[in-house]
């Protein structure tokens, strides 16, 4: 089974802290964004803008996590 072997070897990489923070901020930002859109609140704009800003910060953490997990062999670096 190809999927079974892939899921069995799944690991977060070298920077698990950035991964956990990015996932946490994704969840919080999405909840705030949906709360601002769907709930009948008088301060809906605060929730929408805050959720969008948190999702943007989460995107930065995803980029940092991905960049720190890139592996380049020493031969390609010409060291």
Curated annotation (Swiss-Prot):
Induction: Induced by FOXA1 in well-differentiated colorectal cancer (CRC) cells.
A Gene Ontology BP annotation from the UniProt entry: intrinsic apoptotic signaling pathway in response to endoplasmic reticulum stress
Subcellular location: Endoplasmic reticulum membrane
Transmembrane segments: 17-37, 46-66
Membrane topology: Multi-pass membrane protein
Pfam family, any one: TMEM238
Keywords, sorted A to Z: Endoplasmic reticulum, Membrane, Transmembrane, Transmembrane helix
Record keyword S-adenosyl-L-methionine present: no
Any one GO cellular component localisation term in the record: endoplasmic reticulum membrane
Additional record remark: The TMEM238L transcript is unstable, and this instability is partly mediated through a conserved region containing AU-rich sequences in the TMEM238L 3'UTR. Cancer cells lacking this conserved region display decreased proliferation and clonogenicity.
Subunit text: Interacts with BRI3BP.
Functional note: May play a role in inducing apoptosis during endoplasmic reticulum (ER) stress and in the inhibition of proliferation and tumorigenicity.
Protein name: Transmembrane protein 238-like
Gene name as annotated: TMEM238L
């Amino acid at each position: 089974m190809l999927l079974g072997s892939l899921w069995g070897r799944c690991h977060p990489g070298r920077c698990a802290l950035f991964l956990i923070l990015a996932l946490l901020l994704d969840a919080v930002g999405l909840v705030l964004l949906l709360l601002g859109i769907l709930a009948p609140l008088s301060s809906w704009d605060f929730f929408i803008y805050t959720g969008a800003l948190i999702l943007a910060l989460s995107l930065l953490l995803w980029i940092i996590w991905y960049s720190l997990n890139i592996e380049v062999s020493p031969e390609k670096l010409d060291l």
